[in-house]
């Protein structure tokens, strides 16, 4: 059952169909075991009807083996016909018809860092996690390569969300596999690999994964990471994840975009030239701050 669901139903009909198939199979099994018990039979049939109703009225733009995608209109002050790209019921991208278009705040932040602060022109930028392909939207100055595990995401985004061709190369592959096998080196690697609102696949948070991102960078390259953490960075997950990244890269810049909210986009920037180093603490009795400043 699990083999046929994963290889046949999920691949061809999507996750929702696989879940409904499991529910339907459980109902049939319950009816067979219940025999002539009318109460159990009615309960089973009601469950099947409820599951079917949810699936019939489930507003999904596309459903693949990896995710549910929904594109729909939203209301945002000051924007022209804004629309959202939801992945597994979580907002992945925003876009409107203004000139220039408006994007989600973290995408605006990343675009500003790359184009304005770093002055990137004619640079190679690797984006792990395609989202709505808005990082390169109408951005002809640099060369973008998107890597996403779902082959269908590009066509879905182009047809229903961007309503135009996505700018950049697209490679359907697992992010960790790609950085471990590619011979290419990039000026920037952007990591945005959420499978839902606050969930990163566990194999993409380890020190070994972050070491792999360094492998894909040029010597003077930069790693940019979009995280969703608690706004105060007090949770064990936030502390441990940031510590894991810095165990590979040394000190990184960390910016919380929504400081007044319990959950926030947190943007991390690490340079390939940086490495972990021993640290000291300045104390009244022993303070070498002036010496350290002279050695900058």
Q: At which residue positions do the language-model features occur?
A:
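Glycine/proline-centered helix-kink
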Residues: 1-6
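SAM/dcSAM-binding transferase cores
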Residues: 70, 262-296
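Conserved SAM-binding strand-loop segment of SAM-dependent methyltransferases
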Residues: 164-175
């Amino acid at each position: 059952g699990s083999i046929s669901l994963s290889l046949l139903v999920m691949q061809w009909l999507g996750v929702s169909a696989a879940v409904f198939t499991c529910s339907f199979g459980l109902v049939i099994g319950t009816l067979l075991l219940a025999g002539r018990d009318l109460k159990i039979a009615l309960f089973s049939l009601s469950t099947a009807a409820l599951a079917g109703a949810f699936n019939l009225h489930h507003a999904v733009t596309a459903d693949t083996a990896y995710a549910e995608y929904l594109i729909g209109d939203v209301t945002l002050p000051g924007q022209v016909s804004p629309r959202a790209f939801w992945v597994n019921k979580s907002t992945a991208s925003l876009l409107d018809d203004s000139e220039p278009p408006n994007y989600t705040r973290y995408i605006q932040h990343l675009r500003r860092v790359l184009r304005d602060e770093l002055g990137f022109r004619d640079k190679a930028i690797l984006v792990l996690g395609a989202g709505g392909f808005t990082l390169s939207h109408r951005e002809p100055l640099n060369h973008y390569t998107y890597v996403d595990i779902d082959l269908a995401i590009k066509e879905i985004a182009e047809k229903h969300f961007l309503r135009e061709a996505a700018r950049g190369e697209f490679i359907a592959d697992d992010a960790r596999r790609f950085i471990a096998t590619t011979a290419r080196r990039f000026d920037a690697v952007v990591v945005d690999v959420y499978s839902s609102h606050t969930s990163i696949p566990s194999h993409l948070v380890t020190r070994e994964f972050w070491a792999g991102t360094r492998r894909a960078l040029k010597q003077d390259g930069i790693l940019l990471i979009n995280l969703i953490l608690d706004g105060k960075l007090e949770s064990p997950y936030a502390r441990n994840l940031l510590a894991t990244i810095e165990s590979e890269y040394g000190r990184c810049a960390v910016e919380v975009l929504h400081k007044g909210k319990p959950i926030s986009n947190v943007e991390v920037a690490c340079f390939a030239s940086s490495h972990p180093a021993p640290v000291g603490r300045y104390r009244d009795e022993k303070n070498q701050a002036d010496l350290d400043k002279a050695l900058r």
